[in-house]
Structures are given as C-alpha cells and as structure tokens.
C-alpha cells in the first residue's frame, strides 16, 4: 500500500493557511479518487482506495504540525507500510509560491512536521513532495507567515502547484518515484 500524507494543522482557523498546503493536496486526491477521509485511531483523518489497481491510503494528521510523527508512525506500523511506500507532502519556505520539488530523502530543512516524522521513524529515507510558499518579505516572523493565508495574487500559482503535486502523486501510484521526479521537478 502507498501512503500519501499531507501535513498541516487541524482546526478552522488554519484551513487556508500556507502551512496547510499538504492538506490541500490530500483533499484534491480524495476528490479525484472518491476517498472518504474519516477520523482514525491514529490521530488523523484517513481513507483508502484502489487506484490504477493499487491500494493507496490518504492521511491528514490531526496532531498539530510539530507532532505529525505521532500520527504517521503508528499508522505505518499498524498497516505494515514500507517506508519506501510513504510520500509526505508539505510546505517549503525556500521555494517560491507555485513551485514543487520532489525528493527521495533528506533532512527536515527546518520544517517541524518533517522533523517529527524523522524523529519517530528514525530515518530520513522517505519520499517528499515540497510545495513552495515563499518567505516573508516584509519582516514578518516566519512562525506568523506560515500561519497566514495566501494573497489573492499568489492563489492561482498555489492552486496550480496543488494540482501538479496531486498529478505527481497519481503518477507515483504506478511509476517509480525517480521517474516522477524527472517528470515534475523543474
């Protein structure tokens, strides 16, 4: 089973924030694949489907971002999912809004949700789809910036990036990730 995890924060006040862009992708995939996300015992919203003949799972952790590993790791253990079949989708300050970047592995890049997953999994060897949110340009603290909403000017590029990330996830169901990286990395 392939597991797609979109990182974000639970609650209405965070719904459309930059930090929740991973949730946007999971919502898009749930719509495409007709997956109903339900609360699971793993402190997250979870659903499964068969896509292109392959079993897939979608997850939106309901822990706060900094505790994402507390949802993801028990889920991986319970369903006996190989770490190689896990793709984590999240926001990236170092990419401009609208850009996506796929990686086979790596450090956290300062992202607390990814830090939590690395800590709980005990490895950096999992696939990622990073979606650019840019950096604050007006001196706004990063912690406030990631919890802010996209500007009207940014929204078209961001929504296009969400669709491209969802397309990459779809391709990753049946295609080696290295090929997906070649097709989607700019």
UniProtKB/Swiss-Prot annotation:
**What InterPro entries does the record tag this protein with?**
Pept_tRNA_hydro (IPR001328), Pept_tRNA_hydro_CS (IPR018171), Pept_tRNA_hydro_sf (IPR036416)
Q: What class of enzyme is it?
A: hydrolase
What residues form the catalytic site here? 19
| Segments traversing the membrane | none
Where are the residues marked Discriminates between blocked and unblocked aminoacyl-tRNA as a site? 9
- Key word tRNA-binding present in the record? yes
Coiled-coil boundaries: none
Where does it sit, as one GO cellular component term? cytoplasm
Q: Which residues bind tRNA?
A: 14, 64, 66, 112
Signal peptide interval: none
Q: Which UniProt keywords apply?
A: Cytoplasm, Hydrolase, RNA-binding, tRNA-binding
Compartments it resides in? Cytoplasm
- Biological process according to GO: protein quality control for misfolded or incompletely synthesized proteins; rescue of stalled ribosome
Reaction catalysed by this chain? Answer: an N-acyl-L-alpha-aminoacyl-tRNA + H2O = an N-acyl-L-amino acid + a tRNA + H(+)
The UniProt record lists the keyword tRNA-binding: yes
The record's listing under Pfam families reads: Pept_tRNA_hydro
Q: Which GO terms of the molecular function aspect are on file?
A: peptidyl-tRNA hydrolase activity; tRNA binding
Name the predominant localization: cytoplasm
- Marked site (Stabilizes the basic form of H active site to accept a proton) residue numbers: 91
Q: What is its EC number?
A: 3.1.1.29
UniProt subunit comment: Monomer.
- Known role: Hydrolyzes ribosome-free peptidyl-tRNAs (with 1 or more amino acids incorporated), which drop off the ribosome during protein synthesis, or as a result of ribosome stalling. Catalyzes the release of premature peptidyl moieties from peptidyl-tRNA molecules trapped in stalled 50S ribosomal subunits, and thus maintains levels of free tRNAs and 50S ribosomes.
Q: Which family does it belong to?
A: Belongs to the PTH family.
Per its record, how is this protein called by name?
A: Peptidyl-tRNA hydrolase
Organism equals Geobacillus thermodenitrificans (strain NG80-2)
Question: Which taxonomic lineage does the organism of this UniProt entry have?
Answer: Bacteria, Bacillati, Bacillota, Bacilli, Bacillales
């Amino acid at each position: 089973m392939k597991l797609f995890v979109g990182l974000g924060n639970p609650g209405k006040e965070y719904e459309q924030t930059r930090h929740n862009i991973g949730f946007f992708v999971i919502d898009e995939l749930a719509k495409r694949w007709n997956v109903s996300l339900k609360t699971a015992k793993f402190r997250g919203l979870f659903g499964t489907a068969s896509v292109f003949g392959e079993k897939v799972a979608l997850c939106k952790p309901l822990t706060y971002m900094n505790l994402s590993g507390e949802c993801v790791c028990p889920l991986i253990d319970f369903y006996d999912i190989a770490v190689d079949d896990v793709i984590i989708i999240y926001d990236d300050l170092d990419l401009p809004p609208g850009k996506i970047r796929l990686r086979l592995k790596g450090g956290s890049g300062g992202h607390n949700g990814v830090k939590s997953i690395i800590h709980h999994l005990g490895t950096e060897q999992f696939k990622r789809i990073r979606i650019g949110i840019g950096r604050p340009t007006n001196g706004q603290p990063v912690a406030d910036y990631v919890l802010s909403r996209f500007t009207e000017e940014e929204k078209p590029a961001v929504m296009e990036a969400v669709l491209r990330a969802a397309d990459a996830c779809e391709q990753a169901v049946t295609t080696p990730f290295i090929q997906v990286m070649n097709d989607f990395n700019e």
